[in-house]
Amino acid sequence: MRPWAGGTAALLVLAGVLSSAALPGAGGRKKVVHVLEGDSGAVVVQTAPGKVVTHRGGTIILPCRYHYDVAAHDPDEIRLKWTKVTEPMAFEDVFVALGAARRAFGSYRGRTALQEDGFGDASLVIRNVTLQDYGRYECEVTDELEDDTGMVKLDLEGVIFPYHPRLGRYTLNFREAQQACREQDGILASHDQLHQAWLEGLDWCNAGWLQDGSVQYPISRPREQCGRKDTPVGVRNYGYRHKDSEHYDAFCFTSNLNGKVYFLKTFRKLSYAEAVQACKDNGAAVAKVGQLYAAWKIQLLDRCEAGWVEDGSIRYPIVNPRARCGGREPGVRNLGF
């Protein structure tokens, strides 16, 4: 690939992994839940209102407590089940407990356990949180024919980044968009994440796939070339599109880095292949697009020099805008492929 005429260096990710796990209950992560005791003797479940927040690599507790009439029920016959809501009527098994028996499922094996902080505590501890853990979880407590459920939303600190590959804009169907985000250290963003990014000022005039199969884009500054100047600000929604035959960009989401992005200064211009080798020689690898965005947003990486990133594009992160440094707004500048 031809190097950028202005000269490039390489943006890197350290090979050494930095510890980012949070202690359970630390930093205000754990919410206190008070249980409402009913008079009927039926199982009553209460979870935390709103959401709990962590970051990739952290440890989080999904709060859930239950109450029931001990005289009417054997504690060993109480079944506790955690599932993740993947679609409006679709669920993924996460963790089940019955008496002393415990079982975790799929990617949650080895990372989940009950908190068991006293009687009636069904709270679930998730360690080494991944991007894929984001979403809504259902806590279900069952005793024979009596049961109750509660819902907990797990949110992640992170950053949205719009993405299209070398082939250009509007070239990705839904599954290709999912893959593109994964390859750049992200996942497809949710509507809630995109809406929050819009509230924080994200303005992007190209529609992209979201996690639920809808296509949307955020507008903070209406203009003629972007859906007309007289239309209101907001997240514009094309609705649910055909996942195989229709093509758009992608809105990806990524979170905390297990490492550090830094700029490797070189004495001359580098081609992409030379940048890859320079990173390798330095004990690292060329940063992915999502890693660069995370370094900009979370680690406040600010560099007014462009460098290669993993997909073959040339970018640079700006936290403090200044003269002759890519405009008046902070962000990750893209000089193209």
Where are these regions (language model features)?
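Extracellular disulfide-stabilized recognition modules
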Residues: 157-175, 205-206, 225-270, 320-329
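N-terminal Sec-dependent signal peptide, specifically the hydrophobic helical h-region
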Residues: 2-52
